[in-house]
């Protein structure tokens, strides 16, 4: 009787330990999921948690909107134009920014209603001036080679936007003028400063599988109250100021910013700001940094930066080995900022001088965290960064 009683205690103890065991990564999932679920994770043809949601499916072209369920990080829940119609871009022209014709990208992006925007064929779209993207939009370049040049996208006071599989490069400073930004008449706008994607006062934004390079100012600038942003699976090359999160040290509205930088590759003559953060809370997870010019990750105004599972391969110059760039404060003060490293891999002499303490996360912060894989996995997790070549009837 006593032996039977002890067996019951042991059984329930083991069951309780199993239930309480945290699930942190794909490896953990493989240990506890049934065999068929484990097989689905490892044979989908994907390399990370976002791509695993959709890339292994040959019917993606018939089910494009399934992508809307795949965002992770602080942009999780961004569904773009899922609840709207499919809008097909049939013309690469942008010759009337005040009254764009139906069939152009600018016409679709400005509409007040939700739209899932796709492209009829390969296109090089030379935007004459900045293109304003309204709320509840998906710009989905899968199935075509879509290049945006000369001017970039502006997201101002909007929510729920997905930008996916778009190549943006050679964005220049452009003058203002009357520009269509919604269903109403065109309104005057100031000139744009050469950002590929400029985001202000917006939320629920997801940029995924884009290739961005060679613009005058930033490739992605997010500021002035923007939050719930994920930049993932993208390729950043040939640029000085890559990602800016936060307008200025004096802009305290950015204290509430939550942003995720995940599964991206930074390479081929990128200099700095990958990202540069002010105020706010940032997870930088499982990215591949293949050399830099000035620094990789930087900031000022006491942001919290959690660097997890990244690969940092430093440049060859001995003076450029530091991963981090601290700005705006004396060294003693900046070493109080919570800039933490976990599971990162440092190569070619890279140096990461952590500071502060591991912060206690709020429920909102915890909910947006992506489980970090070891930095040794960063190369495989980012091997498909940038635009994908997707053909209907086959997995991307």
Curated annotation (Swiss-Prot):
Cofactor(s) this protein requires: Ca(2+)
Record carries keyword Glycoprotein: yes
Enzyme Commission number, as recorded: 4.2.2.2
Enzyme superclass (EC): lyase
Tissue specificity: Pollen and flowers.
Pathway membership, UniProt: Glycan metabolism; pectin degradation; 2-dehydro-3-deoxy-D-gluconate from pectin: step 2/5
Function summary: Has pectate lyase activity.
Family indicated by similarity: Belongs to the polysaccharide lyase 1 family. Amb a subfamily.
Name listed for the protein in its UniProt record: Pectate lyase 5
Source species: Ambrosia artemisiifolia (Common ragweed)
Higher taxonomy: Eukaryota, Viridiplantae, Streptophyta, Embryophyta, Tracheophyta
């Amino acid at each position: 009787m006593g032996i039977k009683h002890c067996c019951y205690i042991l059984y329930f103890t083991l069951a309780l330990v199993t239930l309480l065991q945290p699930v942190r990564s794909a490896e953990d999932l493989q240990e506890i999921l049934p065999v068929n679920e484990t097989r689905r994770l490892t044979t989908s043809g994907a390399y990370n948690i976002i791509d695993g949601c959709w890339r292994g499916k040959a019917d993606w072209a018939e089910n494009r909107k399934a992508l809307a369920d795949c965002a992770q990080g602080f942009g999780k829940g961004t569904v773009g134009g899922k609840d709207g119609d499919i809008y097909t871009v049939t013309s690469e022209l942008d010759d009337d920014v005040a009254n764009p014709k139906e069939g152009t990208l600018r016409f679709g992006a400005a509409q007040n209603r939700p739209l899932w925007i796709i492209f009829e064929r390969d296109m090089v779209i030379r935007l004459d001036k900045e293109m304003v993207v309204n709320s509840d939009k998906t710009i989905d370049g899968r199935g075509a080679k879509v290049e945006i040049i000369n001017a970039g996208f502006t997201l101002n006071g909007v929510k729920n936007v997905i930008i996916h599989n778009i190549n943006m490069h050679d964005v220049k400073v452009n003058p203002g003028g009357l520009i269509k930004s919604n269903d109403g008449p065109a309104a005057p706008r100031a000139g744009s400063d050469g950002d590929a994607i400029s985001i202000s006062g917006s939320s629920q934004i997801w940029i995924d599988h884009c290739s961005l390079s060679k613009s005058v100012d930033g490739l992605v600038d997010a500021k002035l109250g923007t939050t719930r942003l994920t930049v993932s699976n993208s390729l950043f090359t040939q640029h000085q100021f890559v990602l800016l999160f936060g307008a200025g040290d004096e802009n305290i509205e950015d204290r509430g910013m939550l942003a995720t930088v995940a599964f991206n590759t930074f390479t081929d003559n990128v200099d700095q700001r990958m990202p540069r953060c002010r105020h706010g809370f940032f997870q930088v997870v499982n990215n591949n940094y293949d050399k830099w010019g000035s620094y990789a990750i930087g900031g000022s105004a006491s942001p919290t930066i959690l660097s997890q599972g990244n690969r940092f391969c430093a440049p060859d110059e001995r003076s450029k080995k530091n991963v981090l760039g601290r700005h705006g404060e004396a060294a003693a003060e900046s070493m109080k900022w919570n800039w933490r490293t976990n599971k990162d891999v440092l190569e070619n002499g890279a140096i990461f001088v952590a500071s502060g303490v591991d912060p206690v996360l709020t429920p909102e912060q915890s909910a947006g965290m992506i489980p970090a894989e070891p930095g040794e996995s960063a190369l495989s997790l980012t091997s498909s960064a940038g635009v994908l070549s997707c053909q209907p009837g086959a997995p991307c």
